């Protein structure tokens, strides 16, 4: 039921009947009534950066905006404390089973657990992941570390086999039976692609 002549069709031009706002801290131009406008957040409040201009705009032009956590400044009844939207890595046609991962993985891969660290340190979860990565490397735990945050560890722990470095897509999930997920912030009704990526590849 999707297509230019069907009930549902996503258009790039100015002819549309409904609108979906993803995060959208910048005030958009909407030409449909508020009951046809839906907002979906996929970032926690500290990352959304919703301006007062957007909040005033949303009060008049947005029917519902699903957000993970309602900040005290978000007094409009259209803001709903509920998980909004989250993307994930492209999923395989047939997700590998845990048995396949455990018994048929690359013979060169000795570890079955992964963790991803970025080069960011600002959020509580960022800092905690770096503390955990340091502990893993100091104690030589059987956990592989991925992400752009591994560069600092490559200098401190040269030639450490657990440091895998950058990844393109699904490498930290597809051949692992477990992956450590730590969110940047703790908020009701919020979780990120850190969890959905693991679920897609059965790395729970």
Language model: regions and residue ranges:
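Nucleotide-sugar donor-binding catalytic core of glycosyltransferases
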Residues: 1-204
